[in-house]
Each structure stands twice: as C-alpha cells, then as structure tokens.
Amino acid sequence: MKEVTKMLYCALLVTKVIYQMKGKSQPKRERKKQNYWVLKSLWKRPQRQAIMSKLYSKRLPNRCLNFKTASQLLWIAKMQIVQTKINRESLIFLQQRSRNKALVSVST
C-alpha cells in the first residue's frame, strides 16, 4: 500500500504542475479551487487533506512534464489502488470462507 500511496502522490504532483501550466491565465485562488477538485476526485480518503497540504507547501519540479506522462502516471496509480482494493476484498472473502468451513467442520 505504501508504494501505491507514493505513486499516487507523484501522480498528484504531476497533475498539479499540469493544471498550473494550463490555468496560468486564471487568478491563483481559482486555480487552487480547480486543483482541489481534481485532487478530491482522485483521492477520497482522510489522508487527502495531508497530501494536499504537502502539495501546496512543496516546490514544484521543473515544468518539463507533459500531459501524456501525467495521465499515464495517474492511470497506473488508479489501477494500483483498484488492484489493492480487489486484493483486500478477496482476502477478506477467503478468510470468511475458511472461517465458515471451520465452523461447519466443528459442528459436524
């Protein structure tokens, strides 16, 4: 899960750079709001607030990143999160199943 969080954090940094490049003509407050909604749609967890505060406090990397690499990073991060969720759910399911089997074998 740590790797996934790191990957998502990188992806968020990249999107922040891109959204700042795209929204240069907008006032800063408006850009922040836009970034906030982008981040919110990506990261619906309690850690979101911490990540966002880190994003706004960090210095941005050089603006040599393009939209394609950012979208790829985001896609990978999203897939990783989906995968970990699936793995966790299947693990819980298997645990419940084995518990049920144990109960059945004990009762017979």
Curated annotation (Swiss-Prot):
One GO BP: protein targeting to vacuole
Phenotype of gene-disrupted mutants: Deletion causes a vacuolar protein sorting defect.
Domain of life: Eukaryota
Protein name: Uncharacterized protein VPS63
Protein's organism: Saccharomyces cerevisiae (strain ATCC 204508 / S288c) (Baker's yeast)
